[in-house]
Amino acid sequence: MPSPRLLVIEGNSPQTMAEHVSFGGVPASTGYSDLLRELLPGAAVDICHPADPGAVLPDGQSLQGYDGIAITGSSLHIYNGGAAVTRQIDLVREALTTGTPLFGSCWGLQIITVAAGGVVRKNPNGREIGFGRGIRLTAAGRQHPMYVGKLDVFNAPTVHLDEVETLPPGATVLALSLIHI
């Protein structure tokens, strides 16, 4: 089997990435890329920064050329709008037409939701920070390969304020908590 070609879409603005670096961290896309290369030795991993004005895919690449796409978290909020948000929605909307598998974490889930026709809002229950507690797999989640070996109820590190209010047509919920989908 040939090595996979993967795309990581950085959800943060250049300012947020610079702030992470100034505190000794790395941009989310760097962390994702490093982890993917560790889990899949030999994988080719590209990074795209659609929050940046003028950002493009690496030379010679198209979304159809990837075996998978991962979208990071972000400090942005979809309901605040703006060019950085719109560019990401447009890119993901295009990615959805390719049939390439997409994985979205937090912001990534929100961008995929909106690009596919769903609605995201600020959670009326407030921010969840630290650990999401009591995350429950649905029947579909228990059958999904991503959750093989996972407990039916688990905790996971989390920081988010927003939630999916309305699922896009055809979406399937794999897991949820009492606070957020």
Annotated model-derived regions:
Residues 161, 171:
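Anionic-ligand binding region
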Residues 47-56, 137, 156, 175:
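Short gly/ser/thr-rich secondary-structure transition/capping motifs
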Residues 142-149:
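Short, glycine-/aromatic-enriched active-site segment of Class I SAM-dependent methyltransferases
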Residues 1-87, 94-98:
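N-terminal beta1-alpha1 cap of cysteine-dependent amidohydrolase-like domains
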Residues 44-46, 119, 155, 172:
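Conserved beta-strand segments of alpha/beta enzyme cores
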Residues 168:
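Conserved binding/recognition cores within well-folded domains
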Residues 179-181:
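Conserved small/polar residues in nucleotide/adenosyl-binding loops
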Residues 74-141:
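Cysteine-nucleophile active-site neighborhood
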